[in-house]
Amino acid sequence: MDMVRYLISVVSVAVLGGCADYDAELMVADQSQDTAPLSFAVISDVHFGSTTGEGAMVKVPRALKYLSSYGELDAFVVVGDLTESGKRSEYELLVQVFADESNLSYPIDQFLFMMGNHDNYNGNAKSNYQKSLRPFNGGENYPFHSYCVIKGYPFITVSMFGTESNDIDDPSAGSEAYPEETIEWLEQKMALAARECPDKPIFVFTHMPPRWTSIGTWTEHGNGEAWCMSSLNPVLDEYPQAVVFAGHTHYTLGDPRSIHQGVNPDSKRQNYFTVINTSSTSYCELPYGVVDDGVKPMGYDCVTEGLIVNELPNGDIEIRRYDTYRNEEIYPDNRWVLKAPFDGSQFTYADLRDADDNPLGKHLYDGKPSPWFSEGSSLALEVSSSSVTVTFPQADDNDCVSRYSIAVTDVELNEVVASASVFSLFYLNSDMPETLTHTLSGLAPGKEYSIEVRACDSYENVSAPLRSLFRATSSALP
C-alpha cells in the first residue's frame, strides 16, 4: 500500500461524547496524474470476528483478490459492519487482511471505511475504530465521516453511531445513529460536492440504507421488519445526483430490487435519488416471510458479493455485480447503468413499489415477463400414504426466479391440503442446482391429489404451472 503520495482533505465533525477524535482528517491519495476513467469497488458487512461459514479471514481476502483482479481500482470502499462487535482484536484482523498486498491483484492506494451498527457494539467502539485504522490514514486517527474528490468525482462517507435498531418504529434510534451534527455535516458536504463537481454524481456511502429505496426498506411491500432509516432522506432528496451505496440488509445483489431511483421529486417519501444495496461479504439473507426456510436458507453462508463501479466513455456510470465466493459476475448481460445527466431526468430504476407516488406517470419496472419452464418440463413424484416428494426443474426468468409456490389439492374436495414456498437458491449463481426437491406431508391414504408448481420472480410474477395427478398409497396392513 503506497502511503507516500497524499493530498489532505479536511473532514471535521463536531459530535459530543467519549474521547474520540471528531476532527480527524482523511489522507487522500494523489491521483491527479492518472487520466484513466474512474473505477472503484464496494463491499460491506465484512464482520471481522464472525465465524459464519468459512469466516472473514477466508472470505474477505478472497473478495479483495477477485475484485482487484478485474483492473486497477482508484478506491476500495467498505460500507460498515467492519467488525462483529467493535473489538480492537477484530479491527486487528481487518488491518491484517487489507494491509497485506498479497491479497490484491493490483495495488490500491485508497481504502474508505465507515462505521456500521455492529461496529458500535463495544464501550470503546469509536476509539477502536479510529486508532485501529490509522495504517490506512498515514498513521493518524481515521475519520468517522469523510469527503474527498477522486478523478473529479465526489466521495462522501458517513458513519453511523451507537444503535442496534432502525428508526421505523423508534425515530430516536435514527437521531442516535445520525445525530444532528452528522446531518449538518452531510448537508455542507453535499452542497460542496454540487459546487465543486456540478455535472457529476455524488457518491455517498453509509451503512444503513435510506427508507423507501432499495430492497428491505419498504415495510409496505412484504419485507417484515425493515432494515433502514429515514434520517438522511431529507438531505439526500435535495440532490437527484446522489448515488447512495448502503449495506446492512445482507440481501443478495441478484435481486433486481437492489437498485432504486425515485419517480417524484416532490414525494413525501423524500427518495428522489439513487440507492444501491451493497449486499454482504459475510453471508446473505432473504427478506422475512418469502420462503419457508426463513431468512437464512440453505447456502446462505456460501454467498459473498461486491460491486465494481466504472466511468464509461460517454460519462455514464456502469455498475457490475460480482459473486466474490465463486469469482463470477452476476448477470453480466444485465449490468446497471446510471445515465447522464444526473439530474433525475434519466432515472430508469423505479418499480411498482412507487405506483402510488407517480404523478408524472413515469415507467415503473414490473419484472415482466413472468418466469417460464422450458418446453417439456415435468414433475417427478415419490408418493407415500401421507406425503409426496416432488422434484422439478428450475424455471427461467428475465431477472431471477426467486421462489417456487407448491400446492397439493384434494381432488374430491377441491381444497388445498398442503403448500410450500421453496427458495430457488438463485444466489448460488453457477452453483445453483438444476433441479429442486421438496416433500409435502399431511395426505390421507388412498386419496387422489393434484400437485402444482409455479415459479415466482421478485415482483411476484407467476409462471404457468407444472401439474401432475397422483394417489396417496394405502396404509400398510397391521
PLM regions: where:
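A short C-terminal boundary segment appended to hydrolase-like catalytic domains
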Residues: 34, 296-412, 416-420, 465, ...
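Beta-strand-rich modules
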Residues: 443-459
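C-terminal motif of bacterial Sec signal peptides marking the signal peptidase cleavage site
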Residues: 17-18
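Active-site-proximal segments of metal-dependent phosphoesterases and phosphodiesterases across multiple
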Residues: 55, 164, 168-179, 193-246, ...
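Recognizes extended acidic, P/S/T-rich segments that occur
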Residues: 403-444
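N-terminal active-site segment of His-dependent metallophosphoesterases
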Residues: 22-91
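Extended active-site neighborhood of metal-dependent phosphoesterases/phosphodiesterases
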Residues: 87-191, 195-197, 231, 254, ...
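Active-site neighborhood of phospho(di)ester-bond hydrolases with catalytic His/Asp-centered motifs
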Residues: 42-44, 75-81, 110-117, 203-207, ...
